């Protein structure tokens, strides 16, 4: 009788490479790596998995699906965990889990493995998502089970013919996709240490950014960014392009001490140039086009959605319901913003929309004013009536 098939979420790094060598004793390991826009050498990763002992190796290009079905709903909901973090890693985990489950069904695998440690958020995100999509699949986490130190991993790797990554002495733990880059560990673990320039990878230091501002126009259709400077492109390509444009101006650097799902605080350095520009630009079009009641209510749901996504509940009914509400609000979110990029700042300086609720003739203080000021007297009386009655009854 043959071995059980196992799907391994494979990154090409030391942890998941050692996992192949360890798991192949009991399983037929199928390595699956998702391209979510991190810019890795995917051919090398594909071949490396086979060299170590995987029976099959797959590279899945999911950039467009990731952008359209995961990043876009988060953008439209202005999803920012603790008002600072655009959920870079948290957004990629659900699609990775989804593809792992699909590959398990396709290959007949009964088990999924991931390379997460026992103290991070991602173990929860993967396992909760997999359980939501197929509760019959088994999940194992070799790195969590081993509790090995890095030196023990290296010893095992050398003894089992696992190639040692060239950048093994890099003190940082980095995760990247098209929505941004996350960095932790090393000197960053002390929150009193200023992040050194070497900790950043996709943004220039604001001090070293160009001395001249750059202006770009971003066009939205139904809440979706579709063009930069009138050049239409897919959402994934637009985000990747904007990462380069805004990154060279030092935009999107975030230094965040965050509350992890597992109960500890961690210090993270994020680089999210495209995300920060698009979030600002999208909000300005909403300010023009959404009625007051929606503008005031939507942020309540946005905060809740941010927490749900961060806390591993992308596939929950609550997430689905909030995304449906947000999508309904986006039907009128059409227009263009002009954004000034300069030394770490992305500032919207102009905006227009065919659905704009801004009426200059109502807002102006010039002779063109057509606001009926006489109506204000009755409005004020009725609006303040409950307060007036309370003051009369309760003597203020």
Swiss-Prot record:
CDD domains: ASS
Residues holding ATP: 9-17, 115
Record-linked Gene3D superfamilies: Argininosuccinate synthetase, chain A, domain 2, HUPs, Single helix bin
Gene Ontology cellular component annotations, sorted alphabetically: cytoplasm
Predominant subcellular localization, coarse grouping: cytoplasm
Catalytic activity, EC: 6.3.4.5
InterPro entries: Arginosuc_syn_C (IPR048268), Arginosuc_syn_N (IPR048267), Arginosuc_synth (IPR001518), Arginosuc_synth_CS (IPR018223), Arginosuc_synth_type_1_subfam (IPR023434), AS_cat/multimer_dom_body (IPR024074), Rossmann-like_a/b/a_fold (IPR014729)
Single Gene Ontology MF annotation: argininosuccinate synthase activity
EC class (word): ligase
Residues the record lists as binding L-aspartate: 117, 121-122
Keyword Cytoplasm attached: yes
Location relative to the cell: Cytoplasm
UniProt keyword Signal present: no
Domain of life, source organism: Bacteria
Keywords of this entry: Amino-acid biosynthesis, Arginine biosynthesis, ATP-binding, Cytoplasm, Ligase, Nucleotide-binding
Annotated GO biological process: argininosuccinate metabolic process; L-arginine biosynthetic process; urea cycle
UniProt family annotation: Belongs to the argininosuccinate synthase family. Type 1 subfamily.
Complexes and interactors: Homotetramer.
Protein name: Argininosuccinate synthase
Gene coding for it: argG
């Amino acid at each position: 009788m043959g071995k059980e098939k196992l799907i391994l979420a494979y990154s090409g790094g030391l942890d998941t490479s050692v996992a192949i060598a360890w798991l192949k004793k009991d399983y037929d390991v199928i390595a699956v790596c998702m391209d979510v826009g991190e810019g890795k050498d995917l051919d090398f990763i594909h071949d490396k998995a086979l060299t170590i002992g995987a029976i099959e190796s797959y590279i899945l290009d999911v950039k467009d699906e990731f952008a359209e079905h995961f990043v876009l709903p988060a953008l439209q909901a202005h999803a920012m965990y603790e008002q600072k973090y655009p959920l870079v890693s948290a957004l990629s985990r659900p699609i990775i889990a989804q593809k792992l489950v699909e590959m398990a069904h396709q290959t007949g695998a009964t088990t999924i493995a991931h390379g997460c440690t026992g103290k991070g958020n991602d173990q929860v995100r993967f396992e909760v998502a997999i359980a939501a999509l197929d509760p019959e699949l088994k999940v194992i986490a070799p790195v969590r089970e081993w509790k090995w130190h890095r030196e023990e991993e290296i010893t095992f790797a050398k003894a089992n013919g696992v190639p040692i990554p060239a950048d093994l002495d890099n003190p940082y733990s980095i995760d990247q996709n098209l929505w941004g880059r996350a960095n932790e560990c090393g000197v960053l673990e002390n929150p009193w240490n200023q992040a050194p320039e070497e900790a950043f990878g996709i943004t220039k230091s604001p001090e070293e950014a160009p001395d001249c501002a750059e202006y770009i126009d971003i066009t939205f259709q139904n809440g979706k960014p579709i063009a930069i400077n009138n050049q239409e492109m897919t959402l994934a390509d637009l985000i990747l392009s904007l990462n380069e444009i805004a990154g060279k101006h030092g935009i999107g650097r975030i230094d965040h001490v965050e509350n992890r799902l597992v109960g500890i605080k961690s210090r993270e350095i994020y680089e999210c140039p495209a995300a920060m520009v698009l979030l600002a630009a999208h909000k300005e079009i909403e300010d023009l086009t959404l009625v007051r009641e929606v503008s005031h209510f939507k942020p309540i749901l946005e905060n809740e959605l941010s927490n749900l996504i961060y806390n591993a509940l992308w596939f929950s009914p609550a997430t689905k319901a909030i995304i449906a509400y947000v999508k309904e609000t986006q039907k009128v979110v059409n227009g263009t913003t002009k954004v000034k990029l300069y030394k770490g700042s992305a500032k919207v300086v102009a905006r227009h929309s065919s659905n704009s609720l801004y009426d200059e003739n109502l807002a102006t203080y010039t002779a063109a004013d057509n606001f009926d000021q006489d109506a204000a007297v009755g409005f004020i009386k009725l609006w303040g009536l409950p307060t007036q009655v309370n003051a009369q009854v309760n003597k203020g």
